[in-house]
Amino acid sequence: LFRSVLFPAVRAQSLEECRQAAEQNYPIIRQYDLIARTTELTVRNIQKAWFPQISVTAQGSYQNKVTAWPENLQGLFAQMGLQLQGLSRDQYKVGIDVRQTLFDGGTIGSRREIARGEGAVQAAQTEVDLYKIGQRVHEMYFALLLLDEQLRLNADANALLRSNEQQLAAMLKSGTASAGDFENVKAERLSAEQQQTDLLSQRQTLQRLLSLFCGIPVDSIRRPPVPNLPSGENKRPELRLFDCRLQLTDAQEKALDAQLLPQLGLFAQGYYGNPGLNLFEDMMKRRWSWNGIAGLKLTWNLSALYTHRNEKSKLRVQRELIENARQQFLFNNRLDETQQSENVRRFRAIAQRDGEIIALRTAVRKAAESKLAHGIIDVNGLLREINKENAAKTQQAIHEIDMLKAMYDLKFSHNE
């Protein structure tokens, strides 16, 4: 209701307009932006691994043994009047540790590609979910189109019955028709009006559902043009999802290979504490001091070899599962396309006879009207012919809508 007040002039009357409106209205559309933002933030965080990594530490400990002067030296110091106690058993330090990566073997880059690959998979899955929304719009749109045709044909039949009812009323006054004939036609006309009311109610319900689904008022729809049948490459979003999942496994494999390479970096450590790096001085004075160390560090994690082969095998199995899922999808999709192609051919063949059948039914109905006027047949014979003519027109409308829907089903299966 709020959207209707804000956007009262928006109308979606074509199939494509309804589909696009439904996609924009469906809550999952917001996931595209959320996925992109999350992926970008993740990549930025990973990239910051190239920044200097700084940590602050504070430590206090107690040791049962510490570095001490040999006993002979302690005796010598005592003779000299020096009281040297050695290092204290309780030791403390507060420091800072800085590390800068120079070469990581491709670990950071592979993590970045994995993050982007995961984002691509999530976006592709969202596209698949949105594509299913199009199928629901597709079904409601053609159901609404069929109801419009049924309403039109029922209105034509109602007008025809009303015309015959008026003719019988005149004949009743002149004494050439019975009251039973007049009442029979009137009852048939009222039945047609009752059916019209039911069809209108169905249309209003379906129209309301489609409007809510699209997020905009759908007042009227128009029959879509006859499309060209698909003949090119299959563009279903599920295929892109499979490709993204395979690309993610490639990034994961590169990350495994990067774990086998050594890493090189600079490091610097500084702390204020007791004891310091000059143990001899601290053994003599036991005082807090500033200390620092810097250098170049090479790290090679050989334990990654333990699981490397198994992890590679897991990725191969994962690729096989993805390819198997792709083949299953393509197989089922080909079955759907084959069935839809056969439906198009079947409805096209059936529709070729509809025009001829309607022309014959119309001629028979007109002849029945003439016979009734001359008293050759009763009103029941006319009603039978009117119903047969209306049924033939209804079947033609159903065949045309079904054929058109089958064509768009085929395009939908191919995403064209």
Question: What are the roles of these predicted feature ranges?
Answer:
Residues 10-65, 176-178, 214-252, 261, ...:
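Bacterial Sec-pathway N-terminal export signals of envelope proteins
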Residues 17, 41, 129-240, 245-247, ...:
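Periplasmic alpha-helical coiled-coil/stalk elements that build and connect Gram-negative outer-membrane
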Residues 30-34, 47, 102-130, 180, ...:
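Sec/SRP-type N-terminal targeting helices
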Residues 57-97, 267-304:
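Small/polar, glycine/serine/threonine/aspartate-rich low-complexity segments that form flexible
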Residues 188-216, 359-416:
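Short segments within alpha-helical structural elements
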